[in-house]
Regions:
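Glycine-rich phosphate/pyrophosphate-binding loop and the adjoining helix
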Residues: 191, 195-247, 255, 260-261
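Structural beta-alpha unit
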Residues: 1-4, 44-47, 64-65, 72, ...
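Short, ordered loop/turn segments at secondary-structure junctions
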Residues: 42, 123, 152-154, 195, ...
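Short beta-strand elements of ligand-binding domains
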Residues: 119-122, 146-152, 319-323
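Short, structured interface segments
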Residues: 134-154
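An anion/phosphate-binding loop that grips the pyrophosphate of nucleotide cofactors and donors
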Residues: 143, 286, 315
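Glycine-rich, Arg-bearing micro-motifs that act as flexible, cationic patches
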Residues: 120-138, 270-275, 291-314, 328-330
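Small/aliphatic-rich secondary-structure junction motif
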Residues: 2-61, 161-219, 284, 314, ...
Length: 331
């Protein structure tokens, strides 16, 4: 079984400078994975404005007079952007829709049309002090499809360290296949980052071996859980190969009679809060940060999701969030 396939990419845009930063990255990803790129623009429903016009008796019909002009201009803007940034072989379709909530419309459209990745700018026209604006943040929270959010200029050719966060739970390992695929594709190494929170964390249930110490006990347990996860997902061509050096291993990928390896490092830190430690480490060491998020209620799901959302709001580097499947939540 292949780790990841990215055949269809959806790029939401509001034509702001923030959303434009995603266009060249989408092209780079599409070239690498052989993907088709579709663009979508959501025109927010001007419900209250329409009602006010009617009350004032202004002779203007939103459906007949205003929306058609906005749609026509949006169509032209999308076509110009796709012509400027995308290669012909990666250029897909474009869509303009009128919806009440852009974030909900993006998530639903991506799910309905079986996209493999949503790739969007961290901030659009809704500029805020947070690095990921409200629309992007809501898409990250709600999407069942991986979301790749990019801010400043980003060159995939410079990727050296892909960082995957884990709280040691199986839910957090849902992001492992994509993180490993990215490291493999960009000839980078993968670093798994785990935080032992001072006031309790998911790794508390891991037995400590007094002869090895806390960090080594957690490290060995997580490596074992990853191999179990890969076996459960029938990814028989991928496994973690121990090197004999603590915290330094290899991800071995077998393709027929050929095999290749990805340098795989584990970093364990103690801290008051996971999101604070992740932000600090990722800002200094990571080129791409990959995290699992939630989408369900419940204490464990809330902790996993809120950590991902907090980190995604404030780190400057590209962030990819992956939501575990419903089956994984139910296990």
């Amino acid at each position: 079984m292949k780790m990841v396939e990215i055949k269809k990419i959806l790029v939401p845009t509001d034509f702001s400078k923030g959303s434009e930063r995603a266009y060249p990255v989408a092209q780079e990803v599409a070239e690498t994975f052989g993907s088709a790129i579709d663009f979508i623009h959501i025109i927010p429903t001007l419900k209250y404005f329409n009602e006010s016009i009617k009350k004032l008796g202004v002779p203007l019909d939103m459906e007949k007079d205003l929306y058609p002009k906005i749609i026509d201009e949006s169509e032209r803007s999308i076509e110009r952007a796709m012509d400027q940034y995308l290669r012909k072989e990666n250029k897909g379709d474009h869509f303009v829709k009128i919806e009440r909530k852009p974030s909900d419309a993006i998530v639903e459209f991506a799910k309905k049309n079986n996209y493999d990745l949503i790739l969007m700018g961290t901030r659009g026209a809704d500029e805020t002090k947070m690095l990921r604006g409200s629309v992007t943040e809501r898409v990250i929270r709600k999407s069942r499809i991986p979301v790749f959010s990019v801010g400043d200029r980003f060159d995939l050719n410079t990727v050296d360290n892909v960082v995957l966060t884990t709280d040691s739970s199986e839910l957090s390992l849902a992001a492992f296949p994509l993180a490993a695929a990215l490291a493999d594709t960009f000839d980078a190494h993968l670093t798994m980052f785990h935080v032992i929170e001072l006031y309790g964390s998911a790794s508390e249930d891991i037995p400590r071996d007094p002869g090895k110490g806390e960090n080594v006990s957690i490290y060995e347990a997580i490596i074992e859980r990853i191999n179990d996860y890969l076996a459960e997902k029938e990814m028989d061509n991928v496994h973690i190969q121990r090197t004999g050096v603590t915290f330094e291993d290899e991800i071995v990928i077998t393709d027929g009679e050929q095999s290749r390896s990805i340098p795989f490092y584990t970093r364990i830190e103690k801290g008051v809060s996971a999101h604070y430690e992740i932000e600090n480490y990722a800002s200094e060491e990571a080129d791409i940060l990959v995290m699992a998020t939630h989408g369900h209620s419940g204490f464990a799901h809330l902790i996993l999701g809120s950590t991902a959302e907090k980190v995604a709001q404030y780190v400057k580097i590209p962030v990819i969030t992956v939501r575990p499947s419903d089956e994984e939540f139910d296990d």
